[in-house]
UniProtKB/Swiss-Prot annotation:
GO BP terms: mRNA splicing, via spliceosome; RNA splicing
Entries under InterPro entries matching the protein: Slu7_dom, Splicing_factor_SLU7
A single GO molecular function term of this UniProt record: pre-mRNA 3'-splice site binding
Disulfide bonds: none
Bias (Acidic residues) ranges: 204-223
Gene name as annotated: SLU7
UniProt zinc finger (CCHC-type) residues: 100-117
Protein name: Pre-mRNA-splicing factor SLU7
Pfam families: Slu7
Positions of the UniProt region annotated as Disordered: 1-42, 195-231, 481-548, 555-574
Length: 574
């Protein structure tokens, strides 16, 4: 409904104001109060809902209006003959180069990078010669459709040359056809004899113009016949094919075979005639014997069986409807057929088991009855069927389930991956004619395998290396002792130098200087009290090598979270 200016502006309305608005709306609907006016002074229908008359917040003007529901007026459209005048010049060319003009051609309407002329060796800016005139710049502000119209600005007069070319081709085609027919007529002996005979007998033209024409008229018409070969086309007009769905007029329609009203009925809607149009006639001698044969072709018979099954089931109380649920009916019918076949086989088996006579039902193969067959069968050298109607199943050439030479498994029950050979699973033997050796044979084959031989060769090489070390000469041992003695003396002389850190072996004790260790502990505590940035700056300024004492100080001062005494502090250190 329409609202007042207070409600349009979004202010809170009191009860009295809200009641006054409702009364005004009711009066406007009843016609006792004048209707509201919009910005243009037009009356607004009071029956229009409020959600239509109320403008959104971004288009609200504070007054009731329907301007937001109307389409904005569009500007004038471009005319058909109003378009860019391509290649038009604004005036004569200048004589001197002007400041701000194109450096290449000298025009004022574009810059050098947008110039479409060939780049000159020396531009017009430096030569003041051959200055191009200014182009005529036109501005057209078209609407959305005008900017996207592919035919906007197209000149229909430009298609005139296509029409002229087609007319010239058509004239040449007619002229070529006339010359071809004239040449063919002059050389045709049959036409010459016919004309001579006609002149000799002195016959006049027939007066059957309404039903035909003379040969001369036909010859003249052939000159302009549409069936003539056209120049520039590969289509042979003499061998045109008619449309496939057009019936050839040589055959007779089924409803025209017998015009007797009491004959077979023809249904024009389905174009079908079920019965034969001519009675008392052999169907084999008839060209058309009716469309009833189609009722027994395809799935028509199966559909009749399905419908019969549905009717019989409905009589017995089953709710089967082929039209309402054809899928369920098809599934039930298929299940019924399967059960029927099973029951038929069961009855046959029980009767044969009770009364006998199964041997009389067995039939000899066709090969034995006729003595020969046309079925192609191809056999292998071992007598197996390779190709034919009855292909035998693939079977092994070895005797199955035959245990030889005390084996408990057949040949081929084991496959050795290392040697890619088949064998017996009971003893892992890969020889077909070997005797079974049981678990001892498995161990022997495992020991003689390639992996076991490689492992034994590795152990042998290790033993040889150990023996080689034991065979070192006394001279080499003496040289090593001398070298170790010099190293010890060097260590005594270098006792005052710092010992750099190395990995401690298991059970090895390091000789640490107590004074250096104490100083390292103080430095480590001082480093931990520093901030992160300050410690990083101090680390960059210091040395990069770590001594054994510094490493030991780090280990001693490192906090162990799983140590119950990690938080204990000596009173002397506090």
């Amino acid at each position: 409904m329409l609202s007042t200016s207070t409600s349009l502006q979004g202010g809170k309305v009191s009860r009295e104001e809200y009641r006054r608005q409702k009364d005004l709306e009711a009066a406007r609907k009843a016609g006792t109060a004048p209707a509201a006016l919009d910005e243009q002074g037009n009356a607004i229908n009071p029956h229009i809902p409020e959600y239509i008359t109320k403008a959104p917040w971004y288009a609200d003007t504070g007054r009731p209006s329907l301007a937001h529901q109307r389409i904005n007026e569009q500007g004038p459209h471009l005319k058909l003959d109003e378009w860019y005048d391509r290649g038009a010049k604004a005036g004569p060319a200048a004589k001197k180069y002007r400041k701000g003009a194109c450096e290449n051609c000298g025009a004022m309407t574009h810059k050098m990078k947008d110039c479409v002329e060939r780049p000159r060796k020396r531009g017009a800016k430096f030569t003041n010669k051959d200055i191009a005139p200014d182009e005529l710049v036109q501005q057209f502000e078209g609407d959305y459709d005008a900017k996207r119209d592919r035919w906007n600005g197209y000149d229909p007069a430009s298609y005139k040359h296509v029409v002229e070319e087609y007319e010239a081709t058509e004239q040449m085609r007619k002229k070529y056809r006339e010359e071809e027919i004239d040449q063919q007529t002059s050389t045709d002996m049959a036409v010459v004899k016919k004309l001579a005979k006609k002149d000799k007998e002195g016959k006049v033209e027939d007066d059957d113009d309404d039903f035909g024409s003379s040969d001369e008229d036909e010859d003249d018409e052939d000159k302009y016949a549409d069936a003539a070969d056209q120049v520039g086309q590969k289509l042979d007009t003499k061998t045109r094919i008619t449309v496939r769905n057009l019936r050839i007029r040589e055959d007779t329609a089924k409803y025209l075979i017998n015009l007797d009203e009491s004959s077979a009925y023809y249904d024009p809607k389905t174009r079908s005639m079920r019965d034969a149009p001519v009675r008392n006639m052999n169907p084999e001698d008839m060209k058309f014997a009716g469309d009833n044969f189609q009722r027994y072709s395809g799935d028509a018979t199966n559909m009749q069986k399905l419908q019969l099954f549905a009717w019989q089931s409905a009589q017995k109380g089953s709710n089967i409807n082929v039209s309402a649920n054809p899928t369920a009916g098809e599934l039930l019918h298929r299940e019924f057929q399967q059960k029927k076949e099973v029951l038929k086989d069961t009855n046959k088996t029980s009767i044969l088991a009770k009364y006998g006579g199964e041997e009389h039902l067995q039939r000899m193969p066709n090969e034995l009855l006729s003595g020969q067959t046309e079925n192609y069968v191809e056999y292998s050298r071992s007598g197996q069927i390779i190709k034919g109607r009855e292909r035998a199943k693939a079977r092994s050439k070895y005797d199955e389930d035959v245990y030889i030479n005390n084996h408990t498994a057949i040949w081929g029950s084991y496959y050795d991956l290392s040697t890619s050979q088949w064998g017996f699973a009971c003893c892992h033997s890969v020889l077909p004619g070997s005797y079974c050796t049981g678990d001892a044979g498995k161990l022997a084959n495992a020991a003689s395998s390639a992996s076991a031989l490689l492992a034994s060769s590795n152990e042998r090489s290790k033993i040889e290396e150990a023996a080689e070390k034991e065979r070192e000469s006394l001279a080499e041992q003496h040289l090593k002792d001398l070298a170790s003695g010099k190293a010890k003396k060097g260590k005594e002389r270098e006792w005052d130098l710092p010992q750099y850190a190395k990995r401690r072996e298991d059970g090895e004790e390091l000789d640490l200087d107590k004074g250096r260790l104490k100083n390292a502990l103080k430095e480590e505590k001082k480093r931990k009290k520093m901030g992160e940035d300050e410690a990083w700056q101090q680390t960059k300024k210091g040395k990069t090598d770590v001594t054994q004492e510094e490493l030991e100080a780090y280990r001693l001062s490192r906090q162990a979270y799983d140590d119950p005494m990690s938080n204990y502090q000596d009173p002397e250190d506090q």
